[in-house]
UniProtKB/Swiss-Prot annotation:
Native organism: Human adenovirus C serotype 5 (HAdV-5)
Domain of life: Viruses
Cysteines engaged in disulfide bonds, as pairs: none
Protein name: Early E3 14.5 kDa protein
Function according to Swiss-Prot or TrEMBL: Protects virus-infected cells from TNF-induced cytolysis.
Keyword field contains Hydrolase: no
Family: Belongs to the adenoviridae E3_15 family.
Keywords: Early protein, Host-virus interaction, Inhibition of host caspases by virus, Modulation of host cell apoptosis by virus
GO term, biological process aspect, one: symbiont-mediated suppression of host apoptosis
Length: 128
């Protein structure tokens, strides 16, 4: 496995940078897998209409806390209602929505809390 690095006279610093990059990449991959598992296991009364199931989510962790970013795709809905003998067509178009939820703590259950917060977000913020 080779990484593109500028070679330095002191191989120790280069080696330390390489090891740190590999460790960070492995940690990010582990967090992404954990997030995907949590999304797949999430169940609530909304089913497939839950924001957790509809949104594309990413999870970031740093020294100041955790952040769950979400992106909801553009949606188009069409409804035909009969009024007497005449059909009325209602078309609704919602734009792409994105945001993030920050948690300043560093507990082991933060990801679960962030997922539950995203699930309940539809009750707090009006989405189309």
């Amino acid at each position: 496995m080779t990484d593109t690095l500028d070679l330095e006279m002191d191989g120790i610093i280069t080696e330390q940078r390489l090891l740190e990059r590999r460790r960070a990449a492995a940690e990010q991959q582990r967090m992404n897998q954990e997030l995907q598992d949590m999304v797949n296991l999430h169940q609530c009364k909304r089913g497939i209409f839950c924001l957790v199931k509809q949104a594309k989510v990413t999870y970031d962790s740093n020294t100041t806390g955790h952040r769950l970013s979400y992106k909801l795709p553009t949606k188009r809905q069409k409804l035909v209602v009969m009024v007497g003998e005449k059909p009325i067509t209602i078309t609704q178009h919602s734009v792409e929505t994105e945001g993030c939820i920050h948690s300043p703590c560093q507990g082991p259950e933060d990801l679960c809390t962030l997922i539950k917060t995203l699930c309940g977000l539809k009750d707090l913020i009006p989405f189309n």
